[in-house]
Amino acid sequence: MFVFTKNLFTTKFSSSLLNWRFLRTMADSLVDINERITSQGNLVRSLKSQGASKEDIDKEVAKLLQLKNLKLGGSEVSGKKKDTSFTLKTPKGTKDWCDKDVVLREHIFSTVTEIFKRHGGVTLDTPVFELKEILSGKYGEDSKLIYDLKDQGGELCSLRYDLTVPFARWLAMNPKVTSIKRFHIAKVYRRDQPAMTKGRMREFYQCDFDIAGNYDPMIPDSEALKVLVEALDALEVGNYTIKLNHRKILDGIFTVCGVPDDKIRTISSAVDKLDKLPWEDVRREMVVEKGLKEEVADKIKEYVLLKGDRSLLDKLEADSLLSSNSSAVAAFNDMRLLFDYLEAFGVLDRFSFDMSLARGLDYYTGIIYEAVTEASAPKIKSSAEKKKSADPEADRSNDDSIGVGSIAAGGRYDNLVGMFAAKKNAKIPCVGISLGLERIFSILRSKIPDEDIRANDVDVFVMAFGGGKEWTGFLKERMSVCKDLWANGIKAEFLYKVKPKPRQQFDAADKFDVPFAVILGQDEFAKGSVRIKQMGLKENSDEGQLVPREEMVSVLKKLLKYD
């Protein structure tokens, strides 16, 4: 007996010691991994701040992700999984939509959809992910923001970055479609620095309207911009300006200033930052990071800081250098037509001819534009200001240098379809607009009082009042009344209790600001009548209107203005 107990004790002690050593090793390993994650994260941030190449940054980011996966998965050496706890939350740059936010979002959807259809738009839906090669090489420096999906032994795929490239891919796959007005409202994904309260997210909706086909110059472009103006006016985003430019004017400027052909796109991306950074910072990026000669950068400055109305076009045409560039001259002709057509549509006063607008996406070939509001424009940082944290995972909602950004943008892309088409000459010219739902939402949500948004569309709450031993609660009667209201297109609810108290029913109706109540009084209902009461008034100020049961629907429709 003693030997058995001793062996049992020895066995338990040895096992406990081994477990303690294992846990100690695991703890030490976890500390080591945390230190390595911190060190690797600092290295990635350092490379980004130094303007290192994308290949070098991606290589170190991959190492950082491996370390994070190792931490979550536990020790690979032991082959055992670590029991980890985590904070229940949505991923950075995403959110759950509920309650009044959903109501406002649906209002934006329905508003722009009605306008898109008014102009002849038809719906197109494409997969949320595309083959990786479809998206590669279409977004310039922003390609680093594409989410690549992990290879599962099949096709290499990426989450869509926008709705434009998938549309062009669809056109290339359907050669019989040579013209179309298409709209698409769907989610896109970008690994950007999030600022949640300002609508800068990693998963967000775009509302796109595009016109594809061979038409006379600038006619579809002007209608696309007319659609944009109608949408922003209908949404009541406040005072806004749509900045206009032409890709060929920019190309002409870069050429006459002496920018090498292989640097034109990267210098264009630098110029596009002038809405957020002072010229000194943009110039430094051009010269120090991108190797442009200082005198070339100074020449560019003379052009890209220009902005104004259509009279700016006369000034540019009078420039001897630009007027000798065929690309710029062709763009001048386009702009003159566009200004005339926008004037015909009655929207010319909404536009600013802004030479700093470049749009970083590689697929634009002609007119480009971007809509900003007073609420969406970021504060331009002075070069003396200290830089904020470069952590790409940080939410930058409280960074006053980050605005909502452009609330809509777009342009002409004549060559994108041809990149995918089997025939080399299969080109379908396209022009389109894209509204950023979350950015518009953040502006509207800050302007509209909470009490002005109803989270529920119910117009009538069916109640029952009574008492005494014979009182049943009128559950089946309330169900029957709701059935009649639903059958006549009236949105109605009742409380899921057999014998609800009056206060419970009023509270349920008040929770969603239901405008009317249909009250089944114990005695009145027995006589074939119901009481229709307007809600939201002072207590006891209105007893309601007693109407025959058979007239209930017609009376409610008049009160609700359904007819």
From Swiss-Prot:
One of its GO terms (cellular component) is cytosol. The modification Phosphothreonine is found at T90. Its EC number is 6.1.1.21. GO terms for biological process: cytoplasmic translation; histidyl-tRNA aminoacylation; mitochondrial translation. Coiled coil: none annotated. One of its GO terms (molecular function) is histidine-tRNA ligase activity. It catalyses: tRNA(His) + L-histidine + ATP = L-histidyl-tRNA(His) + AMP + diphosphate + H(+). Keywords: Aminoacyl-tRNA synthetase, ATP-binding, Cytoplasm, Ligase, Mitochondrion, Nucleotide-binding, Phosphoprotein, Protein biosynthesis, Transit peptide. It is found in: Mitochondrion; Cytoplasm. Residues 1-25 form a transit peptide. It comes from the Eukaryota. CDD domains: HisRS-like_core, HisRS_anticodon, WHEPGMRS_RNA. Residues 29-85 form the WHEP-TRS domain. Residues 381-401 are annotated as: Disordered. InterPro entries: aa-tRNA-synth_II, aa-tRNA-synth_II/BPL/LPL, Anticodon-bd, Anticodon-bd_dom_sf, His-tRNA-ligase, HisRS-like_core, HisRS_anticodon, uS15_NS1_RNA-bd_sf. Residues 382-399 have a biased composition (Basic and acidic residues). Belongs to the class-II aminoacyl-tRNA synthetase family. NCBIfam families: hisS. Catalyzes the aminoacylation of histidyl-tRNA in both the cytoplasm and the mitochondrion. PANTHER family: HISTIDINE--TRNA LIGASE, HISTIDYL-TRNA SYNTHETASE. This is Histidine--tRNA ligase, mitochondrial. It comes from Schizosaccharomyces pombe (strain 972 / ATCC 24843) (Fission yeast).
